[in-house]
Every structure is written in structure tokens, then in C-alpha cells.
């Protein structure tokens, strides 16, 4: 009989969001009259920008003609999309990238998992706590860890607590690590890192021959001009950092699927015999073997994000979500809750009232307010006692949800 990958059996429970979905379905089935407002999983609700829709239509029309038909494209992505991203999104930051250093994918979540293919299992990994569950669970799945302890920490991973005391910015590891996960603007806490804070991480990585996995999925939501949008704004980062970006929240592509990875040619690893080798070359080899490229219509739509019209239209959508964030943040603060985030990120990280556990507060909001959020403990032990709300809802639902919560907490 075929044997399973028993590393999956180490996973503590169902993935966070399916568990939330299960509880909501059970509640809705028992209470069909309840109007449940979902501010949990970070799915977008606004339609795609008109310029993006037009590009989609045009690309589909291309596929209907002999002259413009597109079959298999380059696995790394079309140059016209990569160059548009570099020109519009990186050069204004003072960041210079080669076309060969960017890879278009079908989503950042997959990239954050798949990048592990090119790193040896005996690398020591450091992740924040609380953290986007994909970072933790994918390392468990591939066999990098032992079993979890009673807190939920896995042997073999270095956890970096992100708490109120440190402003939800992790401290540098006290031990040597090889791979460091950083996410700014942060999911779930909504915090951001300054250039000075990121410089400490870049210096640590270069001094210890470590590689930073920098998740910049929410960089488009930054409103403070002093906050960096890319790790490559930091001197020395191109020697030690791999950056992930997503079109899911930036352009509403949650149902379209497109992302990108930047792997600078300068980022090096070592072979078992101690020779240096380029991670860029390894990622290219992995990509050409396991991926046939994002679809032509999707890449055409993604390119429209970087047109003048698409850029303007998309900014209006992002502003809409950030106004939602303001409404949630200020409304809950007025209700007496301690809130973080929601200024440079679409997530609000709130402290549960009265020392209530994260899941108890989830059940309270669901059953008493018919509002769905995300328990902080689902992101890691240090998230216990906190709760995440998303700004990606419809405006009228956001306003109603805040009013329900305020009324309930009086």
C-alpha cells in the first residue's frame, strides 16, 4: 500500500479559515434568518477596475483570432508584464531590477509555499508569532519540523513573538537562523516596519548568510510616505531577500489569481560542498519544471493595473477599503476597545475585551452580533486574546457591523 506523507498528520487542526467557515455554516443553518456580515477572511468585494475588465475582454478576443492567439507563454511570465511592474512599481522607489529577476505566478500564497522547494530541509527557519498560517504549515508539511508542543510551537522552527510590548515588530533572533519570514504591512496585526527596522533585518541576514522571505502582499495599502513598500529600498537587501507580491488585494484578483516573486541574482545559497549557487537559477529551474505560467488573459489584465487609467482606478478601490478600515478602527476605539493597524494596512487587530479568549470572542460576535472575524489565536499562540477584522467588506456592511459591535459592548 502506498505510504502517505505523515508530516501532514503533525498539523494541529484544520486550516484556520476552513474552521471559521465550518462554524459559520453551522450557525447559519441553525439561524437562517440571521444576516451574517463577514469581516473575517481577507476576500475583496469591489468589482475589478474597468481598465482591467477591458484588458480581460481584449485578451479573450485575441484568443479568438489566428493572428493574436496565444498558447503556452513563458513560464516566468511575459516580459511586457514584468517590465510594466518594474517601471511603475519598483523604479519610483529607486529599486532597479532585471527582467530575469521577476517571476509571474498564479498567486502569492502558492509562491510562499513553493519557494521551499529550492531550500534544504536542514535550514533553520524563523517566523513571527502571530503569523500568516501558510508560513508555518508549509514548513511542517515538507518535513522541516518535529511535532508541536502544547502551545502549538513546532520543534525546528524559531518563533519570534510579536506582542503589544514590542509594537508587534519581532526582535532579531538570538540564535543563528537561515530563513526569515517577514510580512509588512503585516497580516494579521496591520503593523508596518520603518526603513530603520528593516535595515536591522537586512544587516542580520547578510551577517549570518540568511535569506529573508519578504511578503509585501499589502504594500499598496501603505499611506505613510516614510514607510518602505519594498525590502529592496533597504541597502544590501538584494543580496539577501526574496520578495513576494500579490494582485489579490492590490487589484482585486482573489478570484483571478496572479502574483509575483522577485529573486535577485545576488541572493546566493551554498551546496553541500560549500560552493555558492544562485537561488535565481534554482527558482527558474523549478518554475520551468513545475509551472506552465499564468494564463495569457490574466497577465493581460495584470498589465492593465500598471496603465495610467488602471492605476488611477485601482487607487480609488484601495482608498475605498482604507476608508472602511478607518470606520472600523475609529468605531471600535470609540467603543472602548484597544485597536491596532488599519492605517497602512487593510486589517484591524483588536484586543478582546475583558481578557476573553480569541475563539470565545469569535463565538460572541457570531452569535450575538452576527459578525464574523478571525480569532487571533488562529495565527499563533501570541495572537491569543486578539482578533482580526478585515476592511474588504461592502461599506454598508462595515458600518452596520461596527454599530452592532458597539451596541453589544455597551
From Swiss-Prot:
Substrate binds at residues 15, 42, 109, 132, 187, 292, 388. The modification N6-(pyridoxal phosphate)lysine is found at residue 249. Pyridoxal 5'-phosphate binds at residues 72, 108-109, 132, 187, 218, 246-248, 257, 292. GO terms for molecular function: L,L-diaminopimelate aminotransferase activity; pyridoxal phosphate binding. GO terms for biological process: lysine biosynthetic process via diaminopimelate. The keyword Transferase applies. CDD domains: AAT_like (cd00609). It catalyses: (2S,6S)-2,6-diaminopimelate + 2-oxoglutarate = (S)-2,3,4,5-tetrahydrodipicolinate + L-glutamate + H2O + H(+). Pfam families: Aminotran_1_2. Its cofactor is pyridoxal 5'-phosphate. Gene3D superfamilies: Aspartate Aminotransferase, domain 1, Type I PLP-dependent aspartate aminotransferase-like (Major domain). Pathway: Amino-acid biosynthesis; L-lysine biosynthesis via DAP pathway; LL-2,6-diaminopimelate from (S)-tetrahydrodipicolinate (aminotransferase route): step 1/1. Its EC number is 2.6.1.83. Keywords: Aminotransferase, Pyridoxal phosphate, Transferase. InterPro entries: Aminotransferase_I/II_large, DapL/ALD1, PyrdxlP-dep_Trfase, PyrdxlP-dep_Trfase_major, PyrdxlP-dep_Trfase_small. Belongs to the class-I pyridoxal-phosphate-dependent aminotransferase family. LL-diaminopimelate aminotransferase subfamily. Involved in the synthesis of meso-diaminopimelate (m-DAP or DL-DAP), required for both lysine and peptidoglycan biosynthesis. Catalyzes the direct conversion of tetrahydrodipicolinate to LL-diaminopimelate. Homodimer. This is LL-diaminopimelate aminotransferase.
Amino acid at each position: 500500500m502506498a505510504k502517505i506523507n505523515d508530516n501532514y498528520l503533525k498539523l494541529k487542526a484544520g486550516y484556520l479559515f476552513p474552521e471559521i467557515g465550518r462554524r459559520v455554516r453551522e450557525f447559519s443553518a441553525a439561524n437562517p434568518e440571521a444576516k451574517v456580515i463577514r469581516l473575517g477572511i481577507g476576500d475583496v468585494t469591489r468589482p475589478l477596475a474597468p481598465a482591467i475588465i477591458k484588458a480581460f475582454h481584449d485578451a479573450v478576443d485575441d484568443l479568438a483570432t489566428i493572428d493574436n492567439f496565444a498558447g503556452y507563454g513563458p513560464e516566468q511570465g511575459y516580459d511586457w508584464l514584468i517590465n510594466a511592474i518594474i517601471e511603475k512599481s519598483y523604479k519610483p522607489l529607486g529599486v532597479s531590477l532585471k527582467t530575469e529577476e521577476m517571476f509571474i505566478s498564479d498567486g502569492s500564497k502558492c509562491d510562499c509555499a513553493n519557494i521551499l522547494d529550492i531550500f534544504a530541509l536542514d535550514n533553520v527557519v524563523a517566523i513571527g508569532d502571530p503569523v500568516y498560517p501558510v508560513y508555518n504549515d508549509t514548513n511542517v508539511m515538507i518535513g522541516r519540523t518535529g511535532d508541536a508542543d502544547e502551545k502549538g510551537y513546532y520543534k525546528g522552527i524559531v518563533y519570534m513573538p510579536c506582542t503589544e510590548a514590542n509594537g508587534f515588530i519581532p526582535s532579531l533572533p538570538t540564535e543563528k537562523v537561515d530563513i526569515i519570514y517577514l510580512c509588512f504591512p503585516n497580516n494579521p496585526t496591520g503593523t508596518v516596519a520603518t526603513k530603520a527596522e528593516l535595515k536591522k533585518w537586512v544587516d542580520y541576514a547578510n551577517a549570518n548568510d540568511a535569506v529573508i522571505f519578504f511578503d509585501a502582499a499589502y504594500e499598496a495599502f501603505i499611506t505613510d510616505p516614510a514607510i518602505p513598500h519594498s525590502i529592496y529600498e533597504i541597502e544590501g537587501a538584494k543580496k539577501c531577500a526574496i520578495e513576494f507580491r500579490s494582485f489579490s488585494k492590490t487589484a482585486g484578483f482573489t478570484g483571478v489569481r496572479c502574483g509575483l516573486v522577485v529573486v535577485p541574482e545576488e541572493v546566493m545559497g551554498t551546496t553541500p560542498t560549500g560552493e555558492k549557487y544562485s537561488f535565481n537559477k534554482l527558482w527558474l529551474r523549478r518554475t520551468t519544471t513545475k509551472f506552465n505560467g499564468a494564463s495569457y488573459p490574466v497577465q493581460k489584465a495584470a498589465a492593465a493595473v500598471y496603465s495610467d487609467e488602471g492605476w488611477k482606478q485601482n487607487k480609488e478601490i484601495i482608498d475605498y477599503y482604507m476608508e472602511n478600515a478607518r470606520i472600523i478602527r475609529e468605531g471600535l476605539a470609540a467603543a472602548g476597545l484597544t485597536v491596532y493597524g488599519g492605517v497602512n494596512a487593510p486589517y484591524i487587530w483588536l484586543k478582546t475585551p475583558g481578557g476573553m479568549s480569541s475563539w470565545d470572542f469569535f463565538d460572541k460576535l457570531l452569535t450575538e452580533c452576527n459578525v464574523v472575524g478571525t480569532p487571533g489565536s488562529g495565527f499563533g499562540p501570541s495572537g491569543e486574546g486578539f482578533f482580526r477584522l478585515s476592511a474588504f467588506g461592502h461599506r454598508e456592511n462595515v458600518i452596520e457591523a461596527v454599530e452592532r459591535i458597539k451596541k453589544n459592548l455597551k
